[in-house]
């Protein structure tokens, strides 16, 4: 029987890929590598800097858009993002639909001094230790992909390794689950991973229900400064931008434009 949703299909492939990697590098080996890695950077401090932060993403493809960009040198792209003023660099490592890899994560980590987010579909504890072993400071956890008890344990394990979890939601119900699990950083994805449909009003509906102590990140749909300002007005602390940057002719300048808008005195400030 074929998977029921787009997310189910992605997760099926991820589980197979994780099993293959674990057959090559055991859980005990990846745990040892994680323990030996340099300590993670302070993601919360980066996200609490004044203004609307920009999380700039290294992303080659997506299930909705297909191939986006040929990124021959992810390290160079990450450096451009950092030079443009990005707070965090996100690296998509899922290989089947997004054409990412852990090699991309390694290259980016070695090239920038700001925090790095591993963006993938985390379904096994192995992937958490793997992220830390490859230098991630932050890790994506998708509520729709995890049962509640698993979400809680994954969040606890992520934080026990010193990383910050970006807990992704798409509905008010998922946001409630994220809060009950103890999420400190919640990302609202305008794209429904079940269908790939986009609801651009999603963030504005969900953000007001989140406590002021929670960092709120808007994901998907940022094509320029107008979108950043709209998300800021709805209460975003930061925006995560991928497609709009990798398809731009000058990613450093594209990030710099967003950063300038997000730190301008006229930019709406999140209520705290």
From Swiss-Prot:
PROSITE patterns: IGPS. GO terms for molecular function: indole-3-glycerol-phosphate synthase activity; magnesium ion binding; phosphoribosylanthranilate isomerase activity. GO terms for cellular component: peptidoglycan-based cell wall; plasma membrane. It catalyses: 1-(2-carboxyphenylamino)-1-deoxy-D-ribulose 5-phosphate + H(+) = (1S,2R)-1-C-(indol-3-yl)glycerol 3-phosphate + CO2 + H2O. Keywords: Amino-acid biosynthesis, Aromatic amino acid biosynthesis, Decarboxylase, Lyase, Tryptophan biosynthesis. One of its GO terms (biological process) is L-tryptophan biosynthetic process. Pathway: Amino-acid biosynthesis; L-tryptophan biosynthesis; L-tryptophan from chorismate: step 4/5. The keyword tRNA processing does not apply. It holds the Pfam family IGPS. InterPro entries: Aldolase_TIM, Indole-3-glycerol_P_synth, Indole-3-glycerol_P_synth_dom, Indole-3-GlycerolPSynthase_CS, RibuloseP-bd_barrel. Its EC number is 4.1.1.48. Belongs to the TrpC family. Was identified as a high-confidence drug target. This is Indole-3-glycerol phosphate synthase. It comes from Mycobacterium tuberculosis (strain ATCC 25618 / H37Rv).
